[in-house]
Amino acid sequence: MILADRLEGVAVNLVDKALLLGHVLAWRARWDRRDLDYLPAERISDKFMTGREAASLIPDGATVISSGMAGNSRCSAFYWAIRERYEAEGRPKGLTWISVGGQGGRGRAPGTVEEVGREGLVTRFISGHVETTKSMLALAEKGCLDLHVLPQGEMTELIEGQARGITCVRSRTGLDTFLDPRCGSGSAVFDRNGANLVHADGDELVYELPAIDVALFCGAYADPQGNVYLTDVATITESHESVSAARANGGLAMAVVGGMIEEDPSLPRVPAEMLDAVVVNPYNEQTIMAPQSKPWKMFCPGGDGDDRRAIERLRFINRVLRLTPVRGPVEAALGRLGAR
């Protein structure tokens, strides 16, 4: 009986792997599909616009934040539209880009924040994780982009604080590490002007972020009135906070979603009055390999009831795609230092 149970588990595991490989191949075939001119027929609000129209609202020199984490809740339509506008018109240019979580594809996957890693388009990149953003790292290596790293927790506090007029955060995080300007470089990995976003003050570090002008985030669905729903998204991260910050700073808040639903005030959502633009991308993804039109429940709040199986499936996907960094002893030690 025990042997039979084990064999059944192996069979299920093999079936899972075969299905996941099928998903990988299907995703590879469609991973750069997009319709940047799409408008939903059922829209009522005039806040609905195409991806290209939304990109045209971003001014030169703006500070832009994109929400999301790794391959989850990516703002792909915005990345593509901004890049294509820049390649066609040379605008917007000189952007500062903020990304709390790692949002790159290690130079392998399209539709990540690496799309805007073009010389002159983004001239300063601030993030809590830069290893996956190979295009940004290459620009910094060429001396064309200022690169800054900050702790993710302090970044989210700063973003939330901007909505309340708070411009800095004091913390002991990072003391006596490379983030401490007294013994390291502070936030600056490379900065052409010697600027820094971290300052020492006794037994605390003082962290800062530039004021957010444009907030971009990925929701699941919108209703015809322009409310954006966060059901079935893989990550929410700092979506609410970045929208509130941009609005408080007199800037723009824009969302991309995967489809339309009827209005439902009982569901978690960002209300239409907080948004300046809503873009519908029929190819929008909940996460890598999972279109928003067919969300994977294991990525949704509450999961699918089998967390262990979900974790094993994710590990297998990561081994196949090799998009998630593999951390060695040095990276682990740096992580421990930064989290003291």
What are these language model-derived features?
Residues 2-340:
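Conserved alpha/beta enzyme-core scaffold
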